[in-house]
């Protein structure tokens, strides 16, 4: 599935 922009942001902040 295609991850939404919010999901990508959360993953980036999680780093």
UniProtKB/Swiss-Prot annotation:
Keyword Hydrolase: yes
EC numbers: 3.1.1.59
Superkingdom to which the source organism belongs: Eukaryota
A GO MF term: juvenile-hormone esterase activity
Group of enzyme by EC: hydrolase
Signal peptide start and end residues: none
Keywords for the protein's UniProt record, in alphabetical order: Hydrolase, Serine esterase
Presence of the UniProt keyword Hydrolase in the record: yes
Catalytic activity as recorded in UniProt: juvenile hormone I + H2O = juvenile hormone I carboxylate + methanol + H(+); juvenile hormone III + H2O = juvenile hormone III carboxylate + methanol + H(+)
Function text: JH esterase plays a crucial role in the decrease of JH activity in lepidopteran insects, by hydrolyzing the methyl ester of JH. It is also involved in the transport of JH.
Family the UniProt entry places it in: Belongs to the type-B carboxylesterase/lipase family.
Name by which UniProt lists this protein: Juvenile hormone esterase
Species name: Manduca sexta
